[in-house]
Amino acid sequence: MTTVQIQTIVQIQAIVPNVGAYIPTVWSLAPGQKLGLALSGGGFRASLFHIGVLARLAELDLLRRVDVLSTVSGGSVIGAFYYLKLKKRLEERPLDANGEPVLPTSQDYVDIVAEIESEFLAAVQTNVRMKALLDPVANARMIFSDDYSRSDRIAEVYEECFYSRFSKHPGEKIPLTDLLITPAWMPRGFNVRQYNATSDFKIPILNINATSLNTGGRWVFTATDLGEVPSANPIGTIKPLPRISYSDPTLTPEQQKKLAQIGLSEAVAASACVPAIFTPLAIHDLYPRGANGEEIVVELVDGGVYDNQGVEALLSENCDLMICSDASGQLDGNRTPDIQLLPVATRSNDILATRVRAECYDNLRNCPGDGNFVFFHLRDDFPGNPTYPLLPGPVDRCNGVNDGHIYALSNIRTDLDAFSNVEAYTLMYDGYCLIDYFLQHDESNAGLGAPSPGGAPRRPWRFLAIRSMIKTDKQKLLSHLLIGKYLFFKPFYADPTRAWGVTLILLAPVLFFLWERFDLVVELYKLLVENILYYTLPAALVGAAGYAIVKALDDAPKMLKVFDFIRKYRRADNPLLIALFYAPGLFGAAVAFLNLSIYNKIFLQAGRLPPSDGDALLEPSHGPAQVEAAAQE
């Protein structure tokens, strides 16, 4: 945005006081100032919420001015997708009459988000979680292998569903070393930071955040390097694992080979590697072995363990202005907390996460300057206006009938399964309205529906169709949002008639066979319980106890040698073990296929929006008179 455009905005605000500030004066972004955007974790719930945020930032002409993009977990899934879209748009520019690349415009950024809105949701609705189980061989490898985990598998599915379309070489993953953006009008090897200091169209410095189990530090993947970010004021004695530049001439051939093998999808999988759900993502051979030949195995888990908001990266990059879009979970008050072992452990972990989140917010507040950050979350509300209706409160509870939509939305699962249109559009709409409200500090979201000052014309975003349901059928909307909290059996809540009907049809021949061959069932029961289980259960208990003892001696040199020996035979390419575990792998694949073929479709169909009632968008317009008319609507 130019100085003239900013002055025009200020003049409009003076003429039309009811409109409020489209972009606060502190966001005028003087030359050299850096704008940072943090996209929090929270599974696909967060990813979809952030799409609405990106849409409004593009309309307000701020998205092109983002210097630093920090992402965590679900924010990394969508952040990487946006980054690749932008990379493609900037590197593949059309040529003008003189054969020179045409410079991008603000409209390009709006168009990018419009493509993301439809393409990303389509990929989400394929049900990534279940697609990860479709390959029986991959399932078998995940059971026995020490170097192929659920995190490795989900990285492959991320690549297939989201990122493979951007690969220069079809069928190959995108390596981290290929992430650098070189706009069509710039020479290769240019200095991105120097370019950003003067350019109107920034190249965002992407920080994909994970957490190192080795040291407890923040691990970051960027387009130029990877590794741990040392603390400015360390208080412990653990030394962080050093950052490695992809272009470092001192790298060994083994390190260069490993860096070429690490793909963007692995970085995203590490960032979204929720502990206890996914196995830590392991990186072997990244660092040279120790003096005695000890291997350093980097083990990475979800970036949200360290900082689920992604704020630390913005502070490390010394951003002057910061936006944090927070779609992470919220801690509920509890009048009578459960005091059993597991609930106490879970509650304690949630309290710790809340404390870290509060510290991130405090760090933003303590930055120099006044009002140099925007922080909003899923339980914030916005006032709305007749054209852009608010989501009903209260924000801290829900009666399950006709209020508490914000609370229900904040409790939607943070899973990697399919999200219905109702769920996805409501999340996008909420992010869209919240970023508008918190940027403008306006009491009626007057800027929504009015032209974007200095920016691109607004678009008829698909997610705005949810406004019709908010206006006319709040009860039906709430019922959909309440179903969204369940991890399993959602089709049976969303459309019980179809789900149970299909289930009975599928079970009927099985039940008939069991009835006809009841004698066979009895014999099978005796074989499994009285013979196999009778002998295998004690052996399994003894084995588990032995394993626990061995793990307790994990640091003993002799035991480390034993583990290293076992790892040689637990490699993912061991054909004998693949054959041994193929049967359970095939069973998992069959369950996934059944879910995707039938139940996933039932859930998505139940969550479709009803036909539009013609709730049209405001047409783009220009000038104070049109802005005032929109504000007074």
Description of each model-found segment:
Residues M1-E633:
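Catalytic domains of lipid- and phosphate-ester/thioester hydrolases
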